[in-house]
Amino acid sequence: MSKVNQDIIKRIEEAQLKSDVPAFGPGDTVVVQVRVKEGEKERLQAYEGVVIAKRNRGLHSAFTVRKISSGEGVERTFQTHSPAISSIAVKRRGDVRRAKLYYLRDRSGRSARIKEKLN
């Protein structure tokens, strides 16, 4: 691909980036407001859980949120700059030492808790 094409793609991608995305990372508890279309109507659905993975790739950035629903673990991956996401709110900062928290999949109850970052 030529340099000109790369510059054009870069400019288009930068225009698509959302500017209202808060700083969050693995271990943080977030509330993601997702636009859900049901027939003619559109509503917002809140999805609250712990961020277990984050992928930073500009426009292609994504993060995975895990929550326990009816005693069953549910994970959902969101594209950070997707138009389907209305807002992201950080509810609690988690203090973790890993970038990917996949080990939480094997744990439940008290062992799946994450310490809160105090600063």
UniProtKB/Swiss-Prot annotation:
The entry's family comment says: Belongs to the bacterial ribosomal protein bL19 family.
> Tell me, which GO biological process terms does this entry list?
translation
From the UniProt record, which GO molecular function terms apply? structural constituent of ribosome
Has the keyword Ribonucleoprotein been applied to this entry?
A: yes
The protein here is known as Large ribosomal subunit protein bL19
Q: Which domain of life is it from?
A: Bacteria
Q: Which GO terms describe its cellular component?
A: cytosolic large ribosomal subunit
Does Ribonucleoprotein show up as a keyword for this record?
Answer: yes
- Xref: Pfam families: Ribosomal_L19
What task does this protein carry out? This protein is located at the 30S-50S ribosomal subunit interface and may play a role in the structure and function of the aminoacyl-tRNA binding site.
Protein keywords = Ribonucleoprotein, Ribosomal protein
